[in-house]
Amino acid sequence: MNAKRIRGLLILAAVIAIAVLIWRHFTQTTPAAPGTSEQHAARTSHSENSGSGGGRRAAMRTLAPVQAALTQSASVPHYLSGLGTVTAANTVTLRSRVNGQLMALHFQEGQQVKVGDLLAEIDPRPFQVELTQAQGQLAKDQAALLNTRQDLARYQQLVKTNLISRQELDTQTAAVRQAEGALKADEGAVASAQLQLDYSKITAPISGRIGLKQVDVGNYITSGDTNGIVVITQTYPIDVVFTVPEAEISTILNAQKSGQPPVVEAWDRANQKKLSQGILLSMDNQIDTTTGTIKLKARFDNLDDALFPNQFVNIRMKVDTLKNAVVAPSAAVQMGNDGRFVWILNNKNEVSKRQVTTSIQYGQLVVVTAGLDADVQVVTDGIDRLTEGAKVEIVPSALTEKTPAIAGEKS
């Protein structure tokens, strides 16, 4: 009995709970009072009115943001680039031209020397002895020649009186000639001995920088020593050998025909610092078939020792100046299926694609040879979001006003 009563009470409680939930649901969805509805409508209207300007601003914010720059007309220098190695204008391995003991070295390693400076001495005594002997033989043969000439003069008088035969006169004449020949040989021997003595003093054959010595004082050296005494490199001036593609040969030849040798700049390994400026000296007479390049040589004064033999440098050679060329930022030029193109802007900030033809690049600029005129606004950033005819928003940038002017080359 108690169990049935409890069960009935639970069912009654559940029914009451369900009824309460249904009542609360219908009371919340009942339409609001007229005053409340009007207030809600007013708030809604105010919200819409106040948000209309924000909606327009939101619409503007959906425009693709881009940066732009104006193309311009300028005189653009045309440079060819290449990799080069610094080489001494002249390199000499200083060797002795006579054999003997090295008695002295008159230089410091690394110093600059001038042509004719005394650099080393070989023991001169053996050569002085040879010179003395040659001079003695010369004196002896000079006396013999004088005697034979005097005899010839007597024979010439005697033959007139038939006191001697004609054959004896001819014999004496031949003796004089033999003595004259011996005298010439003696003179040559003296000159040779003097030359050997002079060679015992070794002088600088060129002006340049002394390297590290290859032999010490006291050693016996010969003219056939492979390493020699020291190496001298001429660094004032100095040369750079570099290569350019064979396709540029005609451009270089035309530049040489202008009357002035092309200007060549040497830059450091990182291509960040200009080291020196010189001129093109010569071009090789054949192309390297393995690389498709040709060698050129440039010469630099190098008075500041900015270049050193075997140094690696980057080369920039000016071969021409393009007058009144249309230039645009390199960032504006894109590559598509139909070739290179740019996005141009009209006065309504609408973009359109324009096919262009380009040539040389100079810094952050590229020369446009077809498809663009000067003072045309082109997109430089935000290009990946553009479509034909789309309206864009130009955001400030250092390139917005104009492309960077070419220093000293602006037309």
From Swiss-Prot:
Residues 31-58 are annotated as: Disordered. NCBIfam families: PRK11556.1, RND_mfp. Part of a tripartite efflux system composed of MdtA, MdtB and MdtC. Pfam families: HlyD_D23. It is a peripheral membrane protein. Keywords: Cell inner membrane, Cell membrane, Membrane, Signal, Transport. GO terms for molecular function: efflux transmembrane transporter activity. Residues 1-19 form the signal peptide. Residues 31-49 have a biased composition (Polar residues). InterPro entries: CusB_D23, Multidrug-R_MdtA, RND_pump_MFP. This is Multidrug resistance protein MdtA. It is found in: Cell inner membrane. One of its GO terms (cellular component) is efflux pump complex.
